[in-house]
């Protein structure tokens, strides 16, 4: 008798829901312009247990969502086409998961899991007691951020729904499975899938074989950068493999996808340039050409590279004719 749709106001919109059997809540849909959204644990005194199919379909304003620890099911395509969604907090528990719940969410960078019953702040973070030092909190945060990034990449980069496991995420075994899938992607021939794409009329990588291969390499570069930036549990063997891949496609190589991705997609992020320089992607041989590629838009990063070369690279002859004022 309670099965009619009701609404709950949010700061900038509303959640649609129904009461099931007079005992629990099913969220049916959302409309509005909230950037950050916390789904309540209870509505009308009843636990929120289910996000139905397509609950947040194509909600472009959403950037962050925190799901309640009462949740037991997330339906098919629940967040599909949420193109600006960046992070989600999900309870670390067994639950029924539908198909492709984060399909076509190109900007989802982190999927966090949290222990049910642990107090959270407004952004989903754990609230630590006073006895926990700032250093310990930062260490926890760093590890949590790393495997949250890997969990998001399982769906975004690896197309591995079996890795979207909220109870195992971050465990040694889960990371082993993640890296096994990563290696499968990296080892795949760059031309694999081209014929199928043409026959099926898909255009994700372009219709020219050279363009297809180039974009395949770029996707591998993104994957390698992400794993090195989130290196929790990374074996020495895999670390070498990732670095070698990036170096083999840097500026001055037969193909330069590593440098192209770094400049165009991470051109204002110093930590990525630091990583790329540290592994040898930026070196004495290609330094001049790299600076030439960097327009005035990247003046800050050019200055960083000049300082880096002065401090870390052996030869300083190059700087006899350079100054920061010339940027």
Regions found by a protein language model. Give the residues of each.
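Structural signature of tandem-repeat unit edges
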Residues: 2, 8-25, 31-49, 60-73, ...
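Repeat-mediated protein-protein interaction surfaces in helical alpha-solenoids
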Residues: 226-249, 272
């Amino acid at each position: 008798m309670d099965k009619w749709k009701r609404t709950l106001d949010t700061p900038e919109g509303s959640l649609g829901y129904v009461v099931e059997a007079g005992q629990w809540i099913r969220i049916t849909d959302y409309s509005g312009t909230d950037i950050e959204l916390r789904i309540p644990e209870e509505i009308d005194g009843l636990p929120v247990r289910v996000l139905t199919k397509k609950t947040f379909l194509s909600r472009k304003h959403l950037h962050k969502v925190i799901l309640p620890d009462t949740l037991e099911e997330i339906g098919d395509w629940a967040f599909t086409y949420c193109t600006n969604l960046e992070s989600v907090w999900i309870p670390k528990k067994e639950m029924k998961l539908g198909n492709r719940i984060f399909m076509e969410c190109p900007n989802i960078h982190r999927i966090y899991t949290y222990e049910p019953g642990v107090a959270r702040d407004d952004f989903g973070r754990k609230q630590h007691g006073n006895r926990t030092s700032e250093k310990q909190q930062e260490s926890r945060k760093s590890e949590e951020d790393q495997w949250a990034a890997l969990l998001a990449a399982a769906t975004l980069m690896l197309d591995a729904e079996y890795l979207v496991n909220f109870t195992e995420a971050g465990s040694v075994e889960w990371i082993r499975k993640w890296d096994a899938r990563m290696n499968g992607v990296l080892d795949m021939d760059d031309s694999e899938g081209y014929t199928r794409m043409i026959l099926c009329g898909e255009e994700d990588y372009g219709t020219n074989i050279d363009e297809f291969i180039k974009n395949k390499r770029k996707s591998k570069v993104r994957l390698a950068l992400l794993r090195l930036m989130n290196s929790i549990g990374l074996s020495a063997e895999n670390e070498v493999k990732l670095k070698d891949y990036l170096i083999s496609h840097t500026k001055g190589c037969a193909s330069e996808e590593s440098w192209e991705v770094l400049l165009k997609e991470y051109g204002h992020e110093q930590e990525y340039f630091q990583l790329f320089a540290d592994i040898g992607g930026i070196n004495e041989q290609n330094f001049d050409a790299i600076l030439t590629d960097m327009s005035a838009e990247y003046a800050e990063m050019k200055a960083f590279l000049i300082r880096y070369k002065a401090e870390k690279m052996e030869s300083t002859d190059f700087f006899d004719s350079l100054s920061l004022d010339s940027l």
